[in-house]
């Protein structure tokens, strides 16, 4: 997430033309400690295509920048990302990808997620016990060994987790880009945390986390100003689920 922000920030706001035009972004299906590997990450194996020589990539960049050697790296698009599921590499010149089709999905009662705008439906309720919070299982907010695409069926089975699912997909859908969860919710207390995850449900029932986000309610507008909730009042919360 921060890597995407740094890259787009350098492209648009860096003070020199070299910093704006020569920055590279490489995103693969790895953790902090197995960069370039084709070993399974979490509960998923991405195949041999995931393997690259990342040291060689860095040497090419440094040789070009520091030694003036034509390594061919300047002829390559600045962005190179790995598309999970398809398990192939894609290149681009800007982020988000220019061909991105932004699509809204809506939460419905009975655990339904669809592209149809909901009508007058009853709210979904759950009880939150801070003594027994929902655990992290995979994703990006846990330690290196426990991060990544893990199966979260055990987490989704909890009574304090709401799950919304689409119908089984009839065709492949590539989800590449920033994800935002716009949540309308109220609480019985003046402050709480909301979390959201985007999950890929496999035909065998595994629920593999793709990305996630968390928001403390009192900082919903700004981390610099506390705005406590009025219990029972519905608020709009924007949860940044990062990029996938």
Spans of model-derived segments:
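Active-site-adjacent alpha-helix of alpha/beta-hydrolase-fold enzymes
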Residues: 2-23
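Catalytic cores of eukaryotic secretory-pathway lumenal/extracellular enzymes that build
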Residues: 19-48
